[in-house]
Design a protein with these regions (language model features):
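Short beta-strand and beta-hairpin "edge-sheet" elements
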Residues: 45-52, 116-164
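Solvent-exposed edge beta-strands and adjacent loop segments
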Residues: 10-88, 136-148
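A generic alpha-helix preference that emphasizes hydrophobic side chains
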Residues: 6, 78, 153-154
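Intrinsically disordered, low-complexity regions enriched for glutamine and histidine
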Residues: 3-5, 24, 113-115
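Extended hydrophobic/Leu-rich segments
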Residues: 1, 8-9, 51, 109
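Structured catalytic/translocation cores of nucleotide/phosphate-coupled proteins
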Residues: 26, 105-107, 151-153
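Extracellular/virion structural assembly segments
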Residues: 13, 65-134, 164-172
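Protruding loop/beta-arch "assembly-hinge" segments enriched in small, turn-prone residues
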Residues: 2-12, 157-178
């Protein structure tokens, strides 16, 4: 597949070479689970790093012949968003504050996350990129903060149903591939 040179946010994305961190975009659905439509917010504004830990389930065995076998049978991905500075009017703040205020649990914490590969545009669809959507749970780890502002750090636990598709930046919409 031929990769074209693409300009995004007034910066040219190279057709080859190392990928800058900002080209891997992470979005979380800030809408309530009962909402009819997703409301994706991009993560990272106040973050110096955002790492999805894969947490592989690995079993290693040694047999009596001295051989080692390794089985990796699943992943339990999760990521930490710390700090998250609350901003009035931001849908993600409203969602997180609702979790704090109402001490929400179980299905009230369900959401979805989308990882968007900004280095991988969908040809013939301007502003559309290859993306992966996955179900997740939001875990607010604490709230409060210091003099820098009100903070609601949270963890995102990926729960499966990973689907490949396309993400349109202008409308923040995900469409699964057929």
């Amino acid at each position: 597949m031929h990769k074209m040179q693409l300009q995004l946010f007034a910066e040219l994305i190279p057709a080859a070479g190392k990928i800058k961190r900002k080209w891997m975009a992470h979005y979380i659905d800030a809408a309530l689970p009962s909402a009819n439509k997703a409301d994706y917010s991009r993560l990272g504004k106040d973050l110096e790093e955002y790492i999805v830990e894969m947490n592989a389930n690995v079993e290693t065995r040694n047999n009596i012949w001295g051989e080692t076998s390794v089985n990796l049978d699943s992943y339990q991905p999760q990521a930490s968003t710390d700090p998250y500075y609350a901003e009035i009017g931001e849908p993600l703040f409203d969602r997180l504050q609702g979790i704090v205020d109402e001490r929400q649990t179980l299905d009230d914490l369900k959401t979805s996350v989308v990882e968007v590969h900004l280095w991988d545009p969908v040809e013939a669809a301007d502003g559309t990129y290859v993306a992966y959507k996955e179900d997740a749970i939001i875990e607010v780890s604490s709230y409060g903060g210091d003099t820098t502002g009100y903070q609601i750090p949270f963890n995102v636990h990926h729960t499966g149903n990973r689907v490949k598709g396309k993400f349109v930046l202008a409308t923040k919409t995900f469409t699964a591939d057929a």
